[in-house]
């Protein structure tokens, strides 16, 4: 009903009630008329019987009162039916098994097309960064802190306990995904003829190989591979060529004239 209008009971015509209800046909009933629905219907029946024995006008009035008073029980019954249905629904809701819950709804994909930078960083669904995969790159030579290292170079490692240098030869280089450079070492064992204040490659022998590489920041460059014993590419001493060296022009250096081909042939003859 519209706001501001006072309801009026369709049976007793009262305008004040603690609670108002609607009947099955839409009539407005007060709380008192709703509560006495059964008694009103009984009284209406007796009034209707008396009306039949009396005059026609009285009978018509009694029938009218009986019809009006008989409507509340129907509304009460209809309301009771609705109330019972609500109670059944509430009980079923209470007794519902909550063990098996429905699957959560799938998250909606947020499209970032046409939106600003701040919206992209304020998304509700943060994505976890993938785990870093270690990738190792091996090399035969590296450049570290202005020094060009190669396989076979000799480096020194300072011991933390006694503070003495220990020499080793580089066996290989390793670089990880963070550009951290390391080297695999082969230790060089000194002999009785090895000097204490400097490194003499002729007096050292090759020792055990390390399984784990060491970082380049702990290594100090000593010298490149000094001889074939230390895996050098060329020997510092003259060697006899194992194959003929062709394509060279031989001549004398100095004031002595070069020997001609005819003179050399005549001398051999």
From Swiss-Prot:
Entry-linked Gene3D superfamilies: Erythroid Transcription Factor GATA-1, subunit A
Q: Which domain of life is it from?
A: Eukaryota
Biological process according to GO: chromatin organization; chromatin remodeling; regulation of DNA-templated transcription
* Tissues showing expression: Ubiquitously expressed among various tissue types. Expressed in left ventricular myocytes.
Q: Where is this region: Disordered?
A: 63-115
Where in or outside the cell it occurs: the entry states: Nucleus
Q: Which GO terms describe its molecular function?
A: sequence-specific DNA binding; zinc ion binding
Read off the InterPro entries from this record: GATAD1, Znf_GATA, Znf_NHR/GATA
Keywords assigned: Cardiomyopathy, Disease variant, Isopeptide bond, Metal-binding, Nucleus, Ubl conjugation, Zinc, Zinc-finger
A GO-annotated cellular component: nucleoplasm
**How is this protein organized at the quaternary level?**
Component of a chromatin complex, at least composed of KDM5A, GATAD1 and EMSY.
What disease does the record describe for this protein?
Cardiomyopathy, dilated, 2B: A disorder characterized by ventricular dilation and impaired systolic function, resulting in congestive heart failure and arrhythmia. Patients are at risk of premature death.
User: What is the recorded name of this protein?
Assistant: GATA zinc finger domain-containing protein 1
Q: Which organism is it from?
A: Homo sapiens (Human)
Instruction: State the organism's lineage.
Output: Eukaryota, Metazoa, Chordata, Craniata, Vertebrata
